[in-house]
Regions:
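Bacterial Sec-dependent N-terminal signal peptides
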Residues: 1-25
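Tryptophan-anchored aromatic micro-motifs
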Residues: 25-43
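Hydrophilic extracytoplasmic domains
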Residues: 26, 112, 116-117, 127
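Contiguous, well-ordered beta-strand patches that form the walls/edges
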Residues: 38-43, 58-116
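Broad, structure-driven detector of short, well-ordered beta-strand segments within folded domains
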Residues: 45-51
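Short, low-complexity, Pro/Ser/Thr/Gly-rich segments in the mature regions of secreted, periplasmic
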Residues: 125-133
Length: 134
């Protein structure tokens, strides 16, 4: 009956949320994103990708100053134990953006991606939504 349909659709929705989306390095290459959730009153945040670098940017409204933080990355289908620098710049497909921060593996899970938006869940447990700029 109706209840079964609700349960099934709920299970389907939950599985959609839990299953990460796959992306290729070549698809991220050359893209630019603006953070839309969370938002900040005092700054605008964003990120850009090349084949081997993910650069996060913070632009402060008051001063107009922009700070960029470029970090090497690679795409992986799982979270690695150690950072494999030989994978940087290679076109791979997977659900995780892998970076090396403070001598350890830092990761973002690609929870959702469309032609206009990307949702990332970080190792620290926070979720960030970006809108595509180009």
């Amino acid at each position: 009956g109706m209840r079964n349909i609700l349960v099934i659709s709920l299970v389907f929705l939950l599985s959609m949320v839990c299953h990460a989306q796959k992306i290729a390095t070549s698809e991220l290459n050359g893209t630019k994103w603006k953070e839309i959730s969370p938002t900040y009153d005092y700054c605008e945040r964003g990120m850009t990708f090349t084949m081997d670098t993910r650069t996060t940017s913070t632009k402060f409204y008051k001063t107009g100053k922009e700070f960029n933080c470029p970090l090497k990355y690679y795409i992986s289908s799982s979270i690695p134990e150690t950072f494999d620098s030989s994978q940087i710049g290679k076109s791979r497909k997977g659900s995780y953006i892998i970076q090396y921060v403070d001598n350890s593996v830092f990761w973002f899970k690609i929870v959702d991606i469309s032609s206009t938006k990307i949702t990332l869940l970080s190792k620290l447990g926070d979720t960030t939504v970006y809108q595509k700029v180009k």
